[in-house]
């Protein structure tokens, strides 16, 4: 028996993706405080599009995600903390959850892009292993992921999550992608610094209440 998927707004999708990402990348400060979730949502790296959200917007998104059964608020701390419930809600493996998180944070991506970007969140033995996990997400009822056929100027099919509702396959297929850029040392260092700042902010939240 299948159930309808929850439909997420762009802000809800961003916040949910951040919780999925930070659980794997900064487990020592997870579940996230509101301030940590805000910083993660507004990161300049590993986000497409880059957003400039207000604290009230992120807080509202967290509460709406909680109502939809995708996020749970943790109690017993001086500050509110939130954790995602994607794996429990949809019976997902860690690799499948990581793939959904990347699609929530960066939009449509090829299998090779996902393989490179998932490196610190989940382990895939090969591109075929990753495609197998994507096929399982596509084959669910209802599906969580959809494959977008390659369009003009594109070398590979892309994949998109379906948590924001049905997608316009023709429009996405015709959309020209920017050339894939290598993950430069500078970008890697910037991303690491943003992760460190987010972790420090979360620790300060825990100390200061």
Curated annotation (Swiss-Prot):
Transmembrane annotation, as ranges: none
Highest taxon of source: Bacteria
Pfam families: DUF480 (PF04337)
InterPro entries: DUF480 (IPR007432), WH-like_DNA-bd_sf (IPR036388), WH_DNA-bd_sf (IPR036390)
Coiled-coil regions listed: none
Similarity comment text for this entry: Belongs to the UPF0502 family.
Organism of provenance: Mesorhizobium japonicum (strain LMG 29417 / CECT 9101 / MAFF 303099)
Gene3D superfamilies according to UniProt: Winged helix-like DNA-binding domain superfamily/Winged helix DNA-binding domain (1.10.10.10)
Protein name per Swiss-Prot or TrEMBL: UPF0502 protein mll4256
């Amino acid at each position: 028996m299948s159930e309808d998927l929850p439909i997420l707004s762009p802000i809800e999708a961003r916040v949910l993706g951040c919780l999925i990402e930070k659980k794997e990348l900064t487990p020592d400060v997870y579940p996230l405080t509101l301030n940590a979730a805000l910083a993660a949502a507004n990161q300049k790296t590993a986000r497409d599009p880059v957003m400039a959200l207000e604290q009230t917007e992120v807080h509202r998104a967290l509460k709406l995600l909680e109502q939809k059964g995708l996020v749970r608020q943790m109690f017993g701390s001086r500050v509110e903390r939130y954790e995602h419930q994607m794996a429990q809600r949809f019976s997902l493996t860690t690799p499948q959850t990581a793939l959904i998180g990347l699609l929530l944070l960066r939009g449509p991506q090829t299998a090779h892009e996902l393989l490179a970007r998932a490196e610190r969140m989940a382990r895939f033995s090969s591109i075929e292993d990753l495609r197998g996990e994507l096929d399982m997400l596509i084959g669910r009822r209802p599906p969580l992921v959809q494959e977008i056929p390659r369009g003009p100027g594109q070398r590979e099919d892309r994949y998109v999550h379906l948590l924001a509702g049905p997608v316009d396959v023709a429009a996405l297929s015709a959309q020209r992608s920017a050339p894939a850029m290598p993950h430069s040392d500078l970008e890697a260092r910037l991303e690491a610094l943003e992760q460190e700042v987010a972790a420090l902010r979360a620790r300060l939240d825990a100390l200061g209440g």
